[in-house]
A protein has these predicted regions:
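Ser/Thr-rich, Pro/Gly/Ala-heavy low-complexity intrinsically disordered linkers and tails
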Residues: 119-128
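Domain-level detector of nuclease and nuclease-like folds
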Residues: 1-117
Length: 128
């Protein structure tokens, strides 16, 4: 029920999963008007279950949170991951905040914020 990835990509995978946790909060997709799941990172492997293809589950548990935070800390965002985030933004208009602000993972998931939140999260009109 567990998986392991290459050490050089552990942080990348962790940030992708953490992004899915904050991005997918349930509700309806803005374009397709189809339901989206509420994806939640947890530390309890008993909650994590496989959902068959084509079956909608309103809540999806994934993790393990403590392992993902370890991977995130051990493998910080590099130039390739930042470039990918920029390219995704140029096409989709969304960014992974854990690549732009790695410190937010510990702040959000471990409640250990090392600095006050910034007055502006993203520049260049992204928040508009």
């Amino acid at each position: 029920n567990l998986f392991e990835v290459w050490s050089a990509l552990k942080g990348d995978v962790a940030r992708a999963v953490l992004y899915m946790d904050v991005r997918y909060e349930g509700g309806m997709h803005g374009i397709t008007n189809r339901p989206e799941p509420d994806l939640i990172v947890v530390d309890d492997p008993e909650l994590i279950q496989t959902t068959p293809a084509g079956v909608f589950a309103p809540v999806g548990y994934m993790g393990l949170k403590s392992v993902l935070l370890q991977w995130h800390a051990a493998d910080p965002p590099d130039a390739n991951e930042q470039l990918r985030n920029d390219v995704v933004f140029s096409y989709q208009g969304n960014r992974n905040p854990f690549i732009d602000h790695p410190e937010w993972a510990e702040c959000l998931y471990a409640c250990t914020c090392s600095s006050p939140p910034p007055a502006e999260i993203f520049g260049n009109g992204f928040e508009d």
